[in-house]
Amino acid sequence: MGQTIKEIKARLAELTDLSAKEFLEFETDERAGVQAALKSRKKQILAECAEDERLEQMLEFEKELYSQEIELIAGIDEVGRGALAGPVVTAAVILPKNCKIRGLNDSKKVPKSKHHAILSEIQEKALAIGIGIVDAEKIDEVNIYEATKIAMIQAVSKLSLKPEHLLIDAMVLDLPIAQTKIIHGDARSASIAAASIVAKVTRDEMMKDFALEFPEYDFEHNAGYGTAKHLAALTKYGITRIHRKSYEPIKSMVNFKY
């Protein structure tokens, strides 16, 4: 007696190589359910191969360092530089050698619905994670560029392991640690992408808490960025203690307070 469609689907799920002999065998099965299952599994395998290749490319900078016997590599990224309200948050993440996390990318390119699942895997696999936070008051005092550097140095200082090398998204830090500045690093380095996700989720959770304190500004949805609803609330209610007074239109509203 031949295999049932259910049995064939179960076997297909185990296959990861399109050249497997089972594919040729099942292609001779004329049942529509079998052909649909074949087509679906082939599509999945192609997608998995493409993802593996993408993740391999995201280890390019790390592999160059591995070849020099450098393994404690911290990726560093920030979130919140362009927001009108809330802190700038940074993260430093040291991943184990050749670590691949499916779906990992620049947080801006990852669907929000997947952030927490990817964060959980980062937390499970990472050798060390550090987070830096600089509030709006400090941002106004020193400017956002300097505040971001302060937050990044904070993040590095909070790592439980001392990194041998830093991979940083478009920054150079005043630290006695070898470092590489990578433009668009959060989409090109797995370590930086991991830091991007950690910083993003951390900041989003903070903004949800601020939304409870200041419900009129829709912080739980806009994360402090200048959406129409946020700007309308500024016009109606004024600025709060977490707004950046060095940013326009806040700068022109400093006497109109919540």
Swiss-Prot record:
CDD domains: RNase_HII_bacteria_HII_like (cd07182). It comes from the Bacteria. GO terms for biological process: DNA replication, removal of RNA primer; mismatch repair. It catalyses: Endonucleolytic cleavage to 5'-phosphomonoester. Gene3D superfamilies: Ribonuclease H-like superfamily/Ribonuclease H. The keyword Iron does not apply. A divalent metal cation binds at residues 77-78, 169. Signal peptide: none annotated. GO terms for cellular component: cytoplasm; ribonuclease H2 complex. Its cofactor is Mn(2+); Mg(2+). Manganese or magnesium. Binds 1 divalent metal ion per monomer in the absence of substrate. May bind a second metal ion after substrate binding. Belongs to the RNase HII family. This is Ribonuclease HII. It comes from Lactococcus lactis subsp. cremoris (strain SK11). The lineage of its organism: Bacteria, Bacillati, Bacillota, Bacilli, Lactobacillales. The gene is rnhB.
